[in-house]
Amino acid sequence: MYFIDGESVYRYLKNSDMNCIIIDDEPLAREELSSMLQEISGPTVIGSFSNVLYAEKFLSENEVDLVFLDIQMPKMTGLQFIEKIPKSSMVIFTTAYPQYALESYELDAIDYLLKPFNNERLQKAIHKARHY
């Protein structure tokens, strides 16, 4: 595990067809999603960030296939931050608030996952991203 600006950046050596980062201000949500992705052999988590400023720096220096992005965060919402994500990266919104679903699709998100996450729904979202 490496540290960049106080944020954990995970490096897994397993083979994966896709990498991802997780951006969420809630530590338990980040840990839960990372753990679930490992369990289902999902994309390799290469970064986990509690704030968009660290994530923006990481995205400017690394190629990221998929971004799991929380909507309600301090300083900037996920709906605002999506504009700063490179167009080559796909976005799956993660939130406890269903009222943002329509807006997220209008911003070209691949999918929209409600917390708490469940494996079946997560697998469907990843399948959509892999076949996008």
PLM features per residue range, with description:
Residues V52-F58, N62-Y132:
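CheY-like receiver
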Residues M18-N19, T44-I46, S88-V91:
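Short active-site oxyanion
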Residues E26-G47:
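Two-component/phosphorelay signaling modules centered on CheY-like receiver
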Residues M1-N19:
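Non-catalytic signal-transmission and effector/linker regions of two-component phosphorelay proteins
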Residues S8-Y10, V45, F81:
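Polar low-complexity intrinsically disordered regions enriched in Ser/Thr and small residues
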Residues K14, E39-G42, I85-K87:
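Short, structurally constrained coil/turn elements
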Residues D25-E26, I71:
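Generic detector of well-ordered alpha-helical packing
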